[in-house]
Amino acid sequence: MGKSVAARVLAQYFIDKARPFTGYDTDRSHASFARFYADYASPVIVDSYEGLDRIVGSFEEGQGDGNPKSVIVDLAAQTAAPLARWIKDSDLLELLGEMGVAVNFWHLADAGKDSVDLLDRLIDTFGAGPNYFVVKNLGRGSDFSQLDESAALQKARALGARVITLEQLHEASMLKIDRHSASFWAAVNNRSGPDVLGMLERQRVKIWLKTTYAAFDTLPL
């Protein structure tokens, strides 16, 4: 499980909580967020500022209607540099602060050193202001001692970072869900058709969603 799975389950969380949101998928190689939640997410090209500007436009569209909307962006790894330039050149964090919009950076951590280095780079790039959510992704490792003992995590915690755990979903169930481009709601509720989840598979997905939602409930979303 990677960052796109996290974006998908976050989207499902917002749907189940009846919280309006718009989603954007910057990963041109897979576009799985837009594929699994096509009614809520659309691809966005990060090679141009015009493409990235669409993301912030969603906040402006939602102002004044008394129904604030969140935006979920699935960021591909290769988008870090153009994203940072766009944020800096647009003074985006200050602008969103003036609009009353909280910025949440999610760092999906695996058990390796590269993940720690990426967190360090994220903190050094944006510093104080945004919320930082560090997610220990058990789908990509189980020994997070490098992260726990790192200076990067200490710096993140000093800025108020929250640390949660994303449990691993049973692999066979995840493969079936991916094969059919199914939302997590569809995975739990569909009972007919080829290769649908069996009763106990659906139960395991329900438990995984419940555990994940409990972790999300601890965050200022």
PLM feature segments, named:
Residues 79-177:
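Conserved catalytic-core segment of NTP-binding enzymes
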Residues 5-6:
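Hydrophobic positions on the alpha1 helix immediately C-terminal to the Walker A/P-loop
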Residues 176-221:
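NTP-binding/hydrolysis catalytic cores, primarily Walker-type P-loop NTPases
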